[in-house]
A protein has these predicted regions:
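Phosphate-binding site of ATP-dependent enzymes
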Residues: 171-262, 275, 281-282
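Active-site nucleotide/adenylate-binding loops and adjacent lid/helix of ATP-dependent enzymes
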Residues: 2-9, 13-16, 95-101, 105, ...
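Conserved N-proximal alpha/beta basic substrate-recognition cap immediately N-terminal to
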Residues: 11-13, 18-137
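A short beta-strand motif that forms the metal-chelation/ATP-contact edge
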Residues: 73-78, 210-213, 280-292
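ATP-dependent carboxylate activation and anion-phosphoryl transfer catalytic cores
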Residues: 247-313
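Short secondary-structure junctions
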Residues: 56, 128-129, 153, 261-268
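Short hydrophobic segments within beta-strands
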Residues: 7-9, 79, 214
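Glycine-rich phosphate/pyrophosphate-binding beta-alpha loops
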Residues: 82, 167, 227-229, 287-297
């Protein structure tokens, strides 16, 4: 039986009962029924089920637990280390150390690149379409207003650190006064680089698509929308009725292939978030660390992911 560590964090542990952290006492039905239909927890259950079906023993472990013997695992799957961005250097050092003992998926090389949103500049330089993005060196920019790109205040500016995850320190700015206040309070002397982007109204109208790839092949896609007056996109059962059409899949595959050519890498999993604009698809983000993979959105998605893990052992 192959032992698979699911790399997590103590933050994520709160979502799971202790008996669900080790597949030896795992019950898919119990997790699914007590998960309050949380997509994340349901996907965790699907992953555990797929692993155990293939005679693997998955165990949830904290990335910064000093007592873990990584040699005891046949592979380490990065799963839910939600606090990694607060300890980027330490997290990457741990991954580099783990790779000397066992297989890490995705690899340190992939994660190191993807952990800083300055990767968007690499994509743009390679001709991959991204939404407009400006990177501001905080240490050299005491006055944010003098450095802001010429976006539309009515549309709004999005401020976020380049090393971040989820909604942490993400703001929509609609005035110069707000920009100066937020920059001083949340970014100055606290972060190295500020990412500034225009707010994309498409996430409220048509929505944002997440396209998921396993082992170099397109698997499935889901539509997410932000509610009115909100900037956070989410996948709902209503949105699940919408499937990407062939033209969207074809365009996303082309973006993925250009990404792989750029990186000369072979990640196990990749999620590409895009919006549709008049000029075509634009990349919002590429997720290769601990993305939510929407395994519940396609019947064989978890099986495909696990097949990729086993292939690399």
């Amino acid at each position: 039986m192959k032992k698979i560590a699911l790399l997590s964090s103590t933050i994520a542990f709160g979502l799971f009962e202790p008996e669900h952290r080790d597949a030896r006492t795992f019950s898919y039905e119990k997790v699914a029924s007590t998960a309050d239909l949380s997509h994340f927890t349901l996907d965790y259950a699907l992953l555990l089920q797929a692993l155990t079906d293939q005679h693997c023993l998955p165990t949830l472990v904290a990335w910064n637990d000093p007592h873990i013997d990584w040699r005891a695992f046949d592979a380490v799957l990065i799963h839910s280390p939600w606090d990694y961005y607060e300890h980027q250097d330490a997290f990457l050092n741990v991954l580099r150390d783990i790779e000397t003992h066992t297989v890490v998926l995705n690899s340190w090389k992939t994660v190191a690149w993807n952990s800083d949103k300055k990767y968007l500049q690499d994509l743009s330089d390679a001709g991959i379409p991204i939404i407009p993005s400006a990177f501001i060196n905080v240490a050299k920019t005491p006055d944010i207003l003098a450095a802001l790109p010429n976006y539309n205040w009515t549309q709004g500016y999005v401020f976020k650190p380049t090393v971040s995850a989820g909604a942490s320190n993400v703001f929509v700015i609609t005035s110069s006064e707000q920009a100066a206040k937020i920059y001083t309070q949340y970014f100055l002397n606290k972060h190295n680089t500020l990412l500034v982007q225009p707010f994309m109204e498409e996430i409220r109208t048509e929505g944002e698509w997440s396209l998921i790839f396993f082992e170099g092949h397109y698997s499935h896609g889901v539509l997410k929308k932000a509610e009115a007056e909100n900037i956070w996109v989410k996948h709902s059962m209503e949105n699940q009725k919408h499937l990407p059409d062939e033209s969207l899949i074809k365009a996303s595959v082309a973006i993925y292939q250009r990404l792989i050519a750029l990186r000369q890498d072979s990640p196990l999993y990749t999620r590409i978030d895009v919006i549709k604009r008049i000029e075509g698809l634009c990349v919002m983000e590429v997720e290769q660390i601990e993305p939510y993979l929407y395994l519940h959105a396609k019947a064989d998605a978890a099986k495909k992911l696990v097949a990729g893990i086993i292939k690399r052992l």
